[in-house]
């Protein structure tokens, strides 16, 4: 299962096409729209969210609520397009008096993209590199999420830090499975702890008062996974590498850890590795801890997969940093776009989708099949074999 997506931030729409989707998968339009709404939520979002009310339109690959084995096309309309029809026209001549973007923002793709593509207008770069494009990615991920849910896998996320405000958890790589959707989604910053939520909101307010932006970290958790997804034989097989690539593909992500992550460099081996035990009640091998975050040797262990992701502050500042005007080559203030103060809660929702795609691919590779019935049968057989190995 893979997807491609197209569209500009202020174009008419964003489009995603998901290929290699097995037939017989039930897809919920309302669930995709719910994920799109979660992406738009979160304390610290900017004015664009008051304009857009994202909903998905599916134009191929689904009939009567089930996939039919052909590519699924999903579209999300940009309501703000009506304010940009002249400046973002697909055809015709450039309008007279068009204001070009010539003061690239530090920390954004503006300057390097303009140099790479030989353009004197950073608008061509920022329209595509804008995080607005993640609406299409979240819509596409709805297919992967439905696929995983049908196989008993759940993917969720929560924010554990914004600026200096941190949700201090006890044994997070085990206890994270106890957080409910209600705990997470009722928080304005998608943090399952009320005290930490208040502290995070205060950090966002501090950045807003200073006309600045602020970043943070979040965790993505996947439960219900079978052991053995991914591989150890080649570099491309390793699920750790695939997940890292997928998470780093999201705008503004600067760090990814699995389980204890960088903390392992400070610990002894006996403090890091998870002892293996036999669970005779469930007929399976398991571990007494989950410091590895559900991944060993590039494969899933069957324990919750836990990734922690760091997001940098958004580079569009209301108190701009210095830059160089590409026309005059003189010092100038960087350009200002309508932007968020903090988008960490929204980025976590995008990351859920990217993790879902990687895991969906891993299931398809391991259990094959052109339809859900075959995939489920193969998965059932694999689970039965695993039980016999632990008896």
Which stretches of residues belong to each language-model region?
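Generic N-terminal targeting/processing segments that precede catalytic cores or assembly contacts
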Residues: 1-391
